[in-house]
UniProtKB/Swiss-Prot annotation:
It comes from the Eukaryota. Its main location: cytoplasm. GO terms for molecular function: ATP binding; microtubule binding; plus-end-directed microtubule motor activity. ATP binds at G106, Q107, T108, G109, T110, G111, K112, T113. This is Kinesin-related protein 13.
Length: 1265
């Protein structure tokens, strides 16, 4: 039977693609500079984006790092560009049925939330989430398929999960959600998932949920998100299969806004610091997961953080993932930027295997949902039946099984814990035992170290004492011999010095006097030259100043001429003004006369009219009282009255106009006269002032020329002050006068214009009034003529007469008005001429102003010349004073020094000559005879004696001791070897012993007796030599007090007691040492001093020993008394120290010298065993043929210690170095190889063992340090 499930599985198998691994896509976005960074002027960008937009170049600590990503968004990138390149492909994959995840990671304040959310409400600044929602809805709507979109929004704050889409109740708002591990992964059952139908509703839900997110203000950002935020979108799309069955395609997209990684120092205090710690913890676990995935680790710590639990499938799972890293361009955040880039680069290397989600049929979904509903109903029914929480049987049995499994696991773990406890207890016991043993070993080691340190200190003391004694002895002998030679030379040199000093006194005095005279003459010459040069300079300055004064004088003369010409022009203008004002005055008089005549005619006319009227009215009124009407009388009266009023008004107005014109003309004439007077006075004053200035200038010039040579600086200052004052006063007065003149000119011009305008207005008014009067008179006459046609003929005649008279008067008035017009025209012409004259005066004033400006231009030139002159003179005076003071001081110093030198030379020479006073205490030369050592040729003797010379101040006591006595008296151990050529003694310290094979012993002998030459010949035949010592040793002694003598004796007694104690300790070890001792008959004898060999010391001997402090007896006697033999060291920790470890000195016996040198440790040590074997074999052969043999001692090498040799003279040197074993030989100015004869008795080493095998065993037992 074909079911929907089988069809669904077949479709999924067909559509299931081949599993391919894909890397996580990594993008980088660089934010632009913030407002705060721009205000601070930050411009340097350590990050650069390549042209291909796939690489980031970062300059860090002098190197350029390069990071490659899938795409890099620069500072100018916009939100739509980021969405189209980074997010849109994953959205398309989600619609096809894949799961996708997009991370946004970066430092706090780099724009993660802006990239993910953007600004709500603006189309340009929308983030990834709203653009994704719009794009999904757009694609689904265009496809026309049935779809369902669900959204959830959660945040992880302080490792707790909170639902941002929960209801607004207080209980659920702050309640953290739980996460459970299931077979399908980690799930959050209480997380609310909202079904969304349109884009606007989901955007509104998103805006509300974003507001609930945890934010705070930090040093990076004012509103920084303090939690991880995950916005999940689940898309269900319905499809129909070929068989007509409905299938559902599911895709899920997680948009993750991670909290910002930040430095703890920049996070702030208290809460912000704790939040940053938790944020960094979760990001650290995410980084561990990323690194483990890139390294292909077996275990990946997904469970370490809530974030990695939720996003487990996105990292190395079946989803398509991309990460967007946001970085800052600021140089301050460079380290965080580099960490972010490396973080993203690691994430890019993670490989996912994206798989498409299985398409589910409608029936299967319904079955799953129905089973879940039934399960939930069972739980509800169980809960409703009884109080409390009840479960179904299936759930109870399942829980019971889980409990049993957990109990069994717990028992197993308890058994394991018990076993581990037993193991831990046993381990503790063993550990305690080992610690006890370790402590005991450490204590023993510390005690042994202390003993070793004490012994090493003791050895170092002896070595230092020995080196000091040897070096001081050699140097003292040399110094004493050289002192006497120096004394002899000093006496001769003193005599010569006295002679040379006496000669040098006279020569020096002569030369110094000559030098003094030469210096004085040179100084005088220099002074004269300086004075001449200064005089020349002063002349040059004087010439320059005279030239500048002449130029200034010329300019001033030109200005004075210009001023004179301007004054003449002003006078001419005054005369012209007077001439022009005279016709104006005449016009004024004529106008006054005309107005007077006019007044008279008007008065006459009025009188005549009155007479006529009186004559006319009396008969008229008397004869016709009855016949006349009231209306006619009223008309006549009114006519007459109007006529009189008009005449009176005209007369009054004409009088006013005339009076006003008279006043204006008088005022104008007065003002012009005053102005002319003022101008004339001003011109006179300017002339006088100019004359005074000229006189002052002449006086100043004469005074300046007279006093220039005597007091140059003072005269210049006074002249400059006077000149500046006079010029400033002159120019100030000129400025004031010109300003006053301009003001007066402007006021006169304005006043004259006003007067002319008023005159013209008055004339117009008078002309209009005359015309009005004529017209009124004519109208009145016409009216009278019309009204009085019926009057008597007498009246008519009188009226006609009156008419004639009136006509005459009117004609006269008309004539007067015409004349008045002529006068006004003449006045206007005169005024225009006057105005032209004033304009010409204005031109003259402009010229005067130009001259004033020229004068102002001259002033800075004068000041410049004055300042330069002042500077030149000041510099000259300063240079004169300085040079004068320098010359005087130098001459005084030179003369004083020369005089002091001349006076101090004889006293200095007298004091410098030191005459050596004879004290009588200088020691004289003393010769000490050093006898040659006793040589023994018998082979049966165990050791040859070495004679030691003990010399005192008198040279009376000479004590000789043999080698055997010196061996008995010295505390010498068998663990030391003496190399006679190089005087090398090695003290083993916990190390294996290697025999010393002498290579070279060089003796430079100036005088060798016959026995020595014989021995040298025999030494060439491989025979041992005896060192001769027949010359003398020179010593010097000092006197000692009794107290010092007693103290030295006490010290010597103490040393003898210590020596006895050491000898008693050594007797216990003699049995062991005798078994290893190899004795042969021949020995090498050396001659040396042993001052502590004899028990009795004389006072002179103690005086001799005061040269060096007393030392233990093992210092020199060990060299003389130690037998040269092979000794096996027993118990090296208890061996006494040797003073030969750091040997540095020389032995001198007259002209004979012994050179001691050791080879360096840098030579090859690998062939030491072979060298020893070859030398031993050669020594066995040579011992059979030789009569005298040198027996060496087998010792162990101590750690390398290098010392520089001290060469006291050419023939006396002792160079000591730590080295490999060497061969010893004696020669006179050449190297002679002397073999060493070893005893080949097997009984000494026990069991017939050879020397080489014993040496090997010793090497294996105690290796070299």
């Amino acid at each position: 039977m074909i079911t929907g499930l089988s069809i669904h599985n077949q479709i999924n198998k067909k559509n299931e693609p081949v599993k391919k691994e894909q890397n996580i896509q990594a993008f980088v976005r660089v934010r632009p500079f913030s407002v705060y960074e721009l205000n601070q002027g930050v411009t340097t960008v350590p990050i650069r984006v390549s042209d291909s937009s796939k690489e980031v170049l970062c300059e860090y600590k002098g190197t350029t790092r390069q990071y490659k990503f899938d795409h890099v968004f620069d500072q100018d990138s916009i939100q739509s560009e980021v969405f189209n390149i980074a997010v849109k492909p994953i959205c398309d994959e989600v619609l096809l049925g894949f799961n996708g995840t997009i991370f946004v990671y970066g430092q706090t304040g780099t724009g993660k939330t802006h990239t993910m959310e953007g600004k709500h409400g603006s189309n340009e600044d929308m983030g990834i989430i709203p653009r994704t929602i719009n794009y999904l809805f757009q694609c689904l709507e265009q496809s026309g398929a049935d779809y369902n979109i669900r959204a959830s929004h959660l945040e992880i704050y302080k490792e707790e999960i909170f639902d941002l889409l929960a209801c607004n109740g207080n209980e659920n708002l702050n309640k953290p959600l739980g996460m459970f591990d299931t077979q399908k992964g980690f799930k959050i059952p209480e997380l609310e998932e909202i079904v969304v139908n349109d884009r606007q509703s989901i955007l509104n839900v998103l805006a509300k949920s974003c507001k609930r997110r945890q934010t705070a203000e930090t040093q990076y950002n004012k509103q920084s998100s303090r939690s991880h935020c995950i916005f999940s979108i689940t898309v269900h799309v319905k499809e129909t299969s070929v068989g007509g069955e409905d299938l559902i395609k599911i895709g899920k997209l997680n948009l993750v806004d991670l909290a910002g990684s930040e430095n703890a120092e920049k996070s702030g205090n208290n809460d912000r610091l704790r939040e940053a710690a938790l944020i960094n913890k979760s990001l650290l676990t995410l980084g561990k997961v990323i690194t483990d995935l890139t390294n292909n680790e077996k275990h990946i710590p997904y469970r370490s953080s809530q974030l990695t639990k939720i996003l487990q499938d996105s990292l190395g799972g079946k989803t398509k993932t991309s990460i967007i890293a946001t970085v800052s361009p600021s140089l301050v955040n460079l380290e965080e930027t580099i960490n972010t880039l490396e973080y993203a680069l690691k994430a890019k290397n993670i490989k996912n295997t994206p798989q498409i989600n299985q398409r589910m049929s409608k029936n299967s979904l319904l079955k799953e949902q129905s089973s879940e509903i039934a399960h939930l109903k069972q739980l509800l029914q169980a809960a409703y039946d009884k109080n409390g929480v009840y479960l179904t049987i299936d759930v109870y049995e399942q829980m019971k099984r889980e409990l049993e499994e957990k109990c069994s696991q717990q028992s197993i773990t308890e058994h394991k814990m018990e076993a581990q406890r037993h193991e831990i207890s046993s381990m503790r016991k063993s550990f305690d035992e080992q610690t006890m043993l370790f402590e005991e070993a450490m204590n023993e080691l510390e005690s042994s170290k202390k003993q070793q340190q004490e012994k090493q200190k003791f050895i170092d003391q002896f070595i230092s004492q020995d080196t000091m004694l040897r070096s001081n002895l050699g140097s003292a002998v040399q110094d004493l011999s050289k002192l006497h030679e120096k004394l002899d030379t000093m006496k001769s040199t003193e005599r010569e010095n006295q002679k040379s000093i006496i000669d040098s006194k006279s020569i020096l005095s002569k030369r110094l006097t000559d030098l003094n005279q030469m210096l004085v003459s040179k100084l005088q010459m220099g002074q004269n030259e300086l004075l001449e040069s200064l005089s020349v300079q002063l002349k040059v300055v004087h010439d320059q100043q005279t030239k500048s004064n002449q130029l200034i004088g010329k300019r001033i003369n030109n200005l004075s001429q210009l001023i004179d010409s301007s004054v003449l022009q002003i006078q001419q203008l005054n005369n012209d003004d007077k001439q022009q004002t005279q016709p104006l005055l005449k016009l004024n008089k004529e106008s006054n006369d005309l107005f007077m005549k006019l007044d008279k005619t008007i008065q006459q006319l009025s009188d005549q009219i009155k007479i006529i009227l009186s004559d006319f009215s009396l008969p008229f009124f008397n004869s016709n009282n009855n016949n006349s009407n009231n209306g006619d009388e009223i008309i006549d009266d009114s006519l007459i009255n109007n006529c009189f009023k008009l005449i009176n008004d005209h007369v009054n107005k004409s009088d006013l106009i005339v009076s006003q014109q008279n006043k204006l003309i008088q005022e104008f004439s007065e003002s012009m006269s005053q102005w002319m007077l003022h101008q004339s006075q001003y011109i006179i004053e300017q002339r006088d002032y100019q004359k005074q200035l000229k006189e002052k200038q002449i006086l100043n010039n004469t005074q300046w020329e007279k006093k220039l040579l005597s007091k140059l600086g003072q005269v210049i200052q006074q002249f400059s002050k006077n000149f500046t004052d006079s010029t400033s006063v002159y120019y100030d007065t000129m400025d004031n006068n010109l300003q006053h003149f301009e003001k007066q000119f402007n006021s006169i011009n304005n006043h004259s214009r006003q007067q002319v305008e008023s005159l013209s207005n008055n004339l117009q008014q008078s002309s209009t009034l005359s015309h009005q009067f004529e017209s009124t008179v004519k109208s009145v006459l016409n009216d009278h003529h019309a009204n009085n046609k019926k009057v008597d003929p007498k009246l008519i005649e009188s009226i006609e007469k009156a008419k004639k008279r009136i006509n005459q008067l009117t004609d006269g008035c008309i004539d007067l008005s015409q004349r008045q017009r002529q006068c006004t025209n003449q006045f206007n012409e005169a005024f225009t001429d006057f105005t032209f004259g004033i304009q010409s005066q204005k031109d003259i004033l402009d010229r005067v102003i130009i001259e004033k400006n020229q004068v102002h231009e001259i002033l800075p030139l004068i000041e410049k010349s004055k300042s330069t002159f002042k500077e030149n003179i000041d510099t000259l005076i300063h240079s004169l004073d300085s040079r004068k003071s320098i010359i005087q001081s130098s001459t005084n110093e030179c003369s004083n020094q020369l005089n002091s030198l001349i006076s101090s030379i004889p006293s200095y020479l007298d004091s410098a000559i030191k005459v050596t006073s004879k004290s009588g205490e200088t020691p004289s030369k003393k010769h000490f005879d050093i006898p040659s050592p006793i040589s023994t040729s018998s082979s049966s003797s165990s050791s040859s004696s070495i004679s030691s010379i003990h010399s005192n101040a008198g040279g009376k006591e000479n004590n000789h001791q043999s080698i055997n006595n010196s061996i008995k008296s010295n505390n010498f151990d068998g663990s030391k070897s003496i190399n006679c050529d190089n005087m090398k003694i090695d003290t083993p310290q916990k190390s294996s012993t290697i025999p010393i094979t002498p290579k070279s012993l060089k003796l430079n002998l100036n005088s060798t007796p016959k026995s020595v030459s014989k021995n040298l010949k025999s030494s060439q035949q491989q025979q041992p030599l005896i060192v001769p010592s027949s010359n003398q040793l020179t010593l010097s002694a000092k006197k000692l007090s009794n107290k010092e003598y007693q103290r030295l004796q006490q010290q010597q007694q103490q040393q003898q007691q210590e020596q006895q104690q050491q000898q008693s300790a050594k007797k216990k070890k003699l049995a062991i040492e005798k078994q290893l001792m190899i004795t042969t008959s021949p020995t090498l004898s050396l001659v040396n001093e042993s001052p502590f060999s004899s028990p009795k010391l004389s006072k002179q001997k103690i005086l001799q020993d005061q040269i060096q402090p007393p030392q233990p007896p093992s210092i020199l006697s060990q060299l003389n008394s130690t037998p040269i033999s092979f000794l096996q060291p027993q118990q090296p920790q208890q061996q006494p120290p040797s003073f030969f470890n750091n040997l540095n000195g020389s032995f001198n016996r007259g002209n004979n010298s012994i050179d001691f040198s050791l080879l360096d440790d840098d030579s090859d040590s690998d062939n030491s065993d072979d060298d020893v074997r070859s030398l031993l074999s050669s020594n066995k052969k040579s011992s059979r043929a030789s009569k005298n043999a040198v027996v060496s001692k087998k010792v162990g090498l101590t750690p390398s210690r290098k010392l520089k040799g001290v060469n006291s003279s050419a023939n006396q040197s002792l160079n000591v170095k730590k080295s490999k074993p060497i061969l010893t030989s004696l020669s006179k100015k050449q190297n002679i190889s002397t073999p060493i004869i070893h005893s080949s008795k097997p009984s000494i080493f026990g069991g017939g063992s050879t020397i080489s095998s014993k040496l090997k065993s010793l090497k294996q037992q105690t290796p070299l340090k």
